[in-house]
Swiss-Prot record:
CDD domains: ATP-synt_Fo_c (cd18121)
PROSITE patterns associated with the record: ATPASE_C
Keyword annotations from UniProtKB, A to Z: ATP synthesis, Cell inner membrane, Cell membrane, CF(0), Hydrogen ion transport, Ion transport, Lipid-binding, Membrane, Transmembrane, Transmembrane helix, Transport
Membrane-topology descriptor: Multi-pass membrane protein
Name of the molecule in the record: ATP synthase subunit c
Organism: Geotalea uraniireducens (strain Rf4) (Geobacter uraniireducens)
């Protein structure tokens, strides 16, 4: 398996795991907020504001995962080393 194939697989798996955690976290946050509003409708404004801030912080996990995966795919610092190693092995 080549270096670039492993980079593509790592980026795909990393993005899948990052978005899986984000989806689960956001689902749990919304579930808790809905339960809180149903128990105390008078506090809905404060609960929803806090939930939105929390969702933004949870969503940052997916953004960080995307950035790392894009770095792995397009700006990999080990690309030159891998190409030199492949040329050396080919000789």
């Amino acid at each position: 398996m080549s270096f670039f194939t492993m980079c593509v697989l790592a980026a795909g798996i990393g993005m899948a795991l990052g978005t899986l955690g984000t989806g689960i976290g956001q689902g749990l946050a919304v579930k808790s907020a809905v339960e809180g509003v149903s128990r105390n409708p008078g506090a809905s404004g404060k609960i929803l504001t806090t939930m939105m801030i929390g969702l933004a912080m949870i969503e940052s996990l997916a953004i960080y995962a995307l950035v790392v995966c894009l770095i792995i795919l397009f700006a990999n610092p080990y690309k030159e080393i891998a190409l030199e190693l492949a040329k050396t092995v080919a000789k």
